[in-house]
Amino acid sequence: EISCSLVGSEMCIRDRYNVAEIIFGGNINMSRVYNFSAGPSMLPEEVLKKAASEMLDYEGSGQSVMEMSHRSKVYDNIIKTAERLLRELMNIPDNYKVLFLQGGASTQFAAIPLNFMNGSNKADYVITGQWAKKAFAEAQKYGDAKAVASSADKTFSYIPKLDKSMFRSDADYVYICMNNTIYGTVYHEIPDTGDIPLIADISSCFLSEPIDVTKFAMLYGGAQKNVAPAGLTICIIREDMLGNARDITPTMLNYKIHADANSLYNTPPCYTIYICKLVLEWIEKLGGLEKMKERNEKKAKLLYDFLDNSKMFRGTVVPEDRSLMNVPFVTDSDELNAKFIEEATKNGLVNLKGHRTVGGMRASIYNAMPYDGVEKLVNFMSDFEKANS
């Protein structure tokens, strides 16, 4: 029996009680829900337990990762291990820099044109949802940003067909959002942009399946969906793209500065990078990105098959462009949608409400969502349909 509390007890710290025992053991009755949030999202339970066990004393250092200096030897090993694992899992070539930054994916909307719209002062954008739309609007502040294709005409329910002839030959880069979190669409094929550098926001499909990094000049994403808690943004940039930022580029938005400093120009989000390392170790243990893709396809198929055969629920995306990560769906009634969300929450299926701009429902089934969670959702949807038909 644990006789002292976790908070405010020097004895607990000095005696080095196992935090995992305090949190997960004893008489504490845990009740974990299935969290379908688009982000921040579920983390693997194995990762949470590992982090809990190391909370007070990381590998005999006598301190939490939250407390240690980002320039200490022990933390240097954490961030270097995270980068090594990411490079191995994604097969990132040596001529690409990996940056662990702050500011979220949204900050990159400005950083990208400031760093890369530096030749013709032109950039081509494909608008497939709110995040691509926001990135495009930001780029327009800095140069000749052009929307070369859009799926806004059908509420972003599909990915436009692209041909390299659509892109301006002198554009400094082409920009896409690989997976559209709100609308549930994804590029199943990487666009052919010829010699024009391709940049992609992969926030909501990061590490969900293999991707050919060499097809891109830059990949980036917020970590709070598939990689870690909120607070970390990972950028993967081909080295030849660096070093030509505009003179007006703020220091903290200059990728070359962060690359030269190995992501330590200022204090990084240390604990979030540590959790990222644990998640990468978890993915490696499962068998890498090919195995992760198999897991994700199995989960998505279960949910899409139900939607395709339901008389009450229907998906909102054309089948050929469906995302493995984000599955939006609706009924024919706003009242029924609201009732479904309320009852699902009571049954431990939380954060199924669709984005405020589109309504309905959305199940985000990222890497950490187990098959059992999707199965429970589908069973609940089936029961709900029978009870409300």
Annotate the PLM regions:
Residues A223-Y304, V318, A387-S389:
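Active-site C-terminal subdomain of aminotransferase-like
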Residues E1-D15:
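Single conserved hydrophobic/aromatic residue that forms the stacking wall/gate
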Residues S106-V174:
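PLP-dependent aminotransferase-like
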Residues N27-V33, K346, G359-S389:
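PLP-dependent enzyme catalytic core of the Aspartate aminotransferase-like
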Residues G62-Q108, N115, Q130, E138:
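Conserved N-terminal alpha-helix of the aminotransferase class I/II PLP-enzyme fold
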Residues R32-E83:
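A glycine-/small-polar-enriched, mobile loop at the entrance of the PLP active site in fold-type I
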Residues G39, A139, S150-F206:
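Active-site phosphate-binding strand-loop segment of PLP-dependent enzymes
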Residues F313-A344:
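Conserved PLP-binding catalytic core of the aspartate aminotransferase-like
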